């Protein structure tokens, strides 16, 4: 059996960070939304016993058992007693270690594909398995935009209208940010100044005034070049611009698709003119995660009968 799906990237429209807990994690209140861009994940399940294999064309450093997608497949096999060989192929489009949830989304995509292949419908068991793999993975199993609390495992649906975004990812290795470092910098800033951990409050209705990220200030303090990227977005017409997750990707919210497209072109032009090493992505938030579909060959996908059957009903 061969299944394919999109592993969407995400942004955090809101990220509020509470104090560090006894287990070393922080309590969070975050609003995450999936995007219409992401990785293409192709999962093949053999009829024979065998290992899990994971390949990422063009990114050999992401091959192998340490990839979150491969770890998700192994965890699924252990939990549900599966010994079939599983081959995973990921066409990587979401930047890596960017605050966009790419690896977590790939892992969730594999879980969704395997759940369909083996007819696993126990959502609670899948959610628990997802949390073992990573804090963001449960979100990518859910229906769409959601408020997440705790480590990210307590999810409640959120009504977020489609938003047109421009994402700017600095590919310069000196601007890379490990998630653990971002939270440590926030803890250090709070310990050394008047900024106390905020009261997280309860999830509410989304409104633009909520846009914000507690990790942004300490990350910008350590990586001042991020402030220039935020300025590029505002200068190109964004109504607001913030960092996503633990960064270093920043994004701007624009009043429409045309405005976002024009801004993306302008920022790309600026990048060619001197702000080298940035990747500019045009995206829109979506209300649902993508479905898992049977793989179809390019020939069958382009046939008249397939085109008719693939139309929404």
UniProtKB/Swiss-Prot annotation:
UniProt GO molecular function: 4-(cytidine 5'-diphospho)-2-C-methyl-D-erythritol kinase activity; ATP binding
Enzyme class: transferase
GO biological process, alphabetically ordered: isopentenyl diphosphate biosynthetic process, methylerythritol 4-phosphate pathway; terpenoid biosynthetic process
Pfam families (UniProt xref): GHMP_kinases_C, GHMP_kinases_N
Compositional bias (Low complexity): 292-307
Name assigned to this protein: 4-diphosphocytidyl-2-C-methyl-D-erythritol kinase
Record family assignment: Belongs to the GHMP kinase family. IspE subfamily.
Binding site for ATP: 95-105
Biological source species: Anaeromyxobacter dehalogenans (strain 2CP-C)
Enzyme Commission numbers on file: 2.7.1.148
InterPro entries: GHMP_kinase_C_dom, GHMP_kinase_C_sf, GHMP_kinase_N_dom, IspE, Ribosomal_Su5_D2-typ_SF, Ribsml_uS5_D2-typ_fold_subgr
Origin: domain of life: Bacteria
NCBIfam families: ispE
């Amino acid at each position: 059996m061969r299944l394919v799906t999109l592993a969407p990237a995400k942004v955090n429209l809101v990220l509020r960070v509470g104090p560090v807990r006894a287990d070393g994690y922080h309590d969070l209140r975050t609003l995450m939304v999936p995007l219409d861009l992401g990785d293409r994940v192709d999962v093949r399940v053999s009829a024979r016993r065998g290992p899990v294999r994971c390949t990422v064309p063009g990114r050999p450093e992401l091959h192998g058992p340490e990839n979150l997608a491969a770890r998700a497949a192994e965890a699924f096999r252990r939990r549900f007693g599966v010994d079939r060989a599983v081959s995973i192929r990921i066409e990587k489009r979401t930047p890596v270690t960017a605050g966009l949830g790419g690896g977590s989304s790939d892992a969730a995509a594999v879980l969704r594909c395997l759940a369909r292949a083996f007819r696993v419908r126990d959502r609670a068991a899948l959610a628990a398995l997802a949390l073992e793999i990573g804090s963001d993975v449960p979100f990518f199993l859910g229906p769409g935009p959601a408020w997440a609390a705790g480590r990210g495992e307590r999810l409640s649906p959120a009504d977020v209208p489609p938003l047109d975004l421009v994402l700017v990812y600095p590919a310069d290795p000196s601007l890379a940010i490990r998630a653990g470092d971002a939270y440590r910098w926030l803890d250090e800033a709070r310990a050394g100044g008047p900024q106390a951990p905020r009261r997280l409050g309860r999830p509410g209705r989304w409104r633009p005034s909520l846009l914000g990220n507690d990790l942004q200030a300490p990350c910008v303090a350590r990586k001042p070049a991020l402030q220039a990227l935020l300025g590029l977005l505002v200068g190109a017409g964004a109504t607001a611009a913030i960092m996503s997750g633990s960064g270093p990707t920043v994004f701007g919210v624009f009043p429409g698709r045309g405005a976002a497209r024009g801004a993306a072109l302008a920022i790309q032009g600026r990048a060619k003119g001197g702000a080298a090493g940035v990747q500019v992505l045009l995206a829109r938030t979506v209300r649902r995660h993508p479905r898992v579909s049977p793989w179809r060959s390019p020939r069958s996908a382009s046939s008249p009968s397939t085109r008719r059957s693939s139309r929404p009903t």
